[in-house]
Design a protein with these regions (language model features):
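Ligand-recognition surfaces built from glycine- and aromatic
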Residues: 308-346, 352
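Short, aromatic/His-centered strand-loop micro-motif at the edge of beta-sheets
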Residues: 188-190, 242-267
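GGW-centered surface loops in extracellular recognition modules
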Residues: 29-81, 93-154, 347-348
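Flexible glycan-contacting loops in extracellular carbohydrate-active proteins
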Residues: 171, 237, 290-319
Length: 357
């Protein structure tokens, strides 16, 4: 069980809570004590079926403020027939009813309905939101300070000192981190090999909001991927923004040009697809560019993954949120659904009226 520490940001105080990571095992039936519930409709509108899809739920709800427990231990999500779903409660502010959560949807194409339940006895998640076969890492940056632990695989990135710690900022979902472009960086453990994929397919994703780049090459994700350094990275900066991957050599494909991507939240996704032997870049839920791997082999290498490069010439300046490392080649439909979920919340997630059981 992972405990998130309290966070105060933008005038909201967030209470600590836990998230299960038991791999999706079933939990006992929900407690029979009286509780409240609201129906949630998810308008996913995917052309193909998505399985074990994590949906972001961010809401400010007066009923939660009035009826939910302060530690959020009574808040849960179920199917419409009461079957518990896997969820992660990232943050809850009892005073305003502000909730940030993720819910794992077993399968969905067009739409699905579920229930938000609260106000009764404490209950547990029915497993982990982040399907172990899919997700290697998922960072939310909800902690008040570094280190920052991911919710999927327990990978940790740690700023070297308080002076090099990116400050909290409002994110695309809850809290994010704002890097100063000077010395802020959060490297992982050099002994952690859990984010290396050899010659297998994988994907990497980050949400960024950049007002002004620091340098020609600002690395928001840095795990090698350059000449003579196997791995992968996202290189932003004053020119085009790139996804890069390589062994001793590397290939790169652009997300787009800096001018078009400044001043707003941008979803960047790189898909390393070994089946088609291509590196694919997606920007804001849509395919951008792609390039063949050629002779690129294993991308395993010594540098640990860093969020915000530790290399002085590649410092990242901007806000980053919801960093993902994924064990599979994500589909275009999956990436597009993630983008709609984060940017079209009022259409993607709708709440019904409160009811009493």
């Amino acid at each position: 069980v992972k405990w998130l520490v309290a966070l105060s940001i933008a005038g909201c105080g967030f209470s600590p809570m836990s998230a299960s990571s038991d791999g999706g095992s079933a939990s006992p039936p929900l407690d029979a004590a009286p509780r409240f519930h609201k129906q949630i409709t998810l308008a996913v509108n995917s052309p193909t079926e998505l399985r074990d899809f994590p949906v972001s739920i961010v809401t400010r709800d007066a009923d939660l403020a009035a009826k939910a427990q302060a530690d959020a231990s009574d808040i849960a999500f179920t199917t419409t027939d009461g079957t518990p779903l896997a969820y992660e409660l990232v943050a809850f502010d009892k005073s305003t009813g502000t909730l940030e959560a993720w819910v794992r949807i077993p399968r969905v194409t067009a739409s699905v309905e579920l229930e938000l339940v609260y106000g009764g006895a404490s209950i547990a998640s029915a497993g982990t939101v982040w399907a172990p076969a899919i997700y290697a890492a998922a960072w939310h940056f909800a902690e008040a300070s570094g280190p920052w632990m991911d919710s999927a695989g327990g990978h940790q990135v740690t700023p070297a000192s308080p002076e090099t710690t990116a400050v909290a900022a409002p994110g695309i979902a809850g809290s994010a981190r704002s890097f100063d472009g000077f010395d802020d960086a959060a490297p992982g453990d050099p002994a952690d090999s859990g984010l290396e994929f050899g010659t297998s397919s994988f994907s990497v994703q980050a949400w960024v909001n950049v007002a002004q780049s620091a340098d020609p090459f600002d690395m928001v994700i840095d795990k090698g991927g350059d000449t003579g350094v196997p791995g992968y990275c996202f290189t932003l900066g004053t020119g085009s923004w790139y996804a890069e991957v390589g062994d001793d050599n590397y290939v790169a494909t652009p997300f787009g040009t800096e001018l078009a991507l400044l001043g707003h939240w941008t979803q960047l996704t790189a898909v390393i697809d070994r089946t088609t032997n291509n590196l694919l870049a997606y920007t804001n839920g849509a395919f951008s560019t792609g390039v063949p791997f050629g002779t690129i082999g294993s991308v395993d290498g010594a540098p640990p993954l860093a969020i915000g490069s530790t290399q002085s010439e590649y410092r990242f300046k901007g806000i980053v949120d919801e960093v993902r490392v994924v064990k599979v080649a994500l589909s275009a439909d999956w990436i597009a659904a993630e983008w709609r979920n984060a940017t079209m919340r009022s259409q993607f997630v709708t709440f019904g009226a409160a009811q009493t059981e």
